[in-house]
A protein has these predicted regions:
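Glycine-rich, aromatic-bearing surface loops/beta-hairpins
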Residues: 108-174
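Short amphipathic alpha-helices in soluble, non-transmembrane regions
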Residues: 33-37, 104-112
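Acidic, serine/threonine-rich, charge-biased low-complexity segments
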Residues: 42-45, 49-53, 68-71, 75, ...
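Short cationic amphipathic helices and targeting signals
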Residues: 16-23, 89-98
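Conserved short beta-strand edge segments in small beta-sheet-based binding/regulatory domains
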Residues: 44, 80-86, 115-124
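Long, continuous compositionally biased terminal/linker segments
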Residues: 2, 53-90, 98
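Short, well-structured hydrophobic secondary-structure segments
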Residues: 26-66
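Terminal, regulation- and interaction-focused segments at domain boundaries
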Residues: 6-27
């Protein structure tokens, strides 16, 4: 059997830093520890589903033109999203360019988190395209869902104001 070529160039993800994390911490504890150490606000979103297995997904954006952070579980019970050597439990993704100093500081901070055995930057020639594309799709779905919810909230607020105005008009005419 011919071995698979695990090298895929990730041209569209050049500004993404991919950190492999080995940790026995459960997802929410790891996210909380990373939040505390890096002053982030990673929040749990809908799981990424591959081959029927849910893999936890955490998301945080520091605002427009800033970094976007994701924490993705690579293990769900007996399923593995992507096998890596050495074994990884999570991917921590940082979108948008980081200065070398900022990357060093983030890596130092991650390695100081109690419960993280190893954290290292993965080379972009690893077989990451599928997971990065899936995460990008998931983010877009979240943005669309949030926008739709904001639109619904705006409509509700307008309706509430119109109802208040109608009540006030009825009170004046009485």
């Amino acid at each position: 059997m011919k071995p698979k070529n695990n090298k895929i160039q990730i041209a569209s993800f050049d500004d993404t830093t991919v950190v492999g994390i080995n940790s026995a911490l459960v997802d929410y504890k790891l996210a909380c520890s990373i939040n505390n150490k890096l002053s982030l606000d990673l929040a749990r979103y809908d799981d990424l589903v591959f081959e029927g297995a849910p893999f936890s997904f955490f998301y945080y954006t520091a605002g427009e033109n800033y970094n976007v952070y994701n924490l993705v579980s690579l293990v769900c019970k007996d399923k593995v999203l992507f096998p890596f050597k050495p074994r990884l439990d999570y991917l921590f993704l940082i979108q948008n360019t980081l200065s070398p100093e900022r990357q060093i500081n983030i890596m130092r901070s991650l390695r100081e988190v109690e419960g993280i055995a190893h954290a290292f930057v993965l080379e972009k020639d690893k077989n990451l395209r599928q997971v990065l594309e899936t995460i990008a799709d998931c983010e877009q779905q979240m943005i669309n869902k949030k926008k739709k919810q904001n639109d619904i909230n705006t409509i509700r607020e307008k309706m509430r104001k119109q109802e208040e105005e109608l009540v006030a008009l009825r009170a004046q005419s009485s």
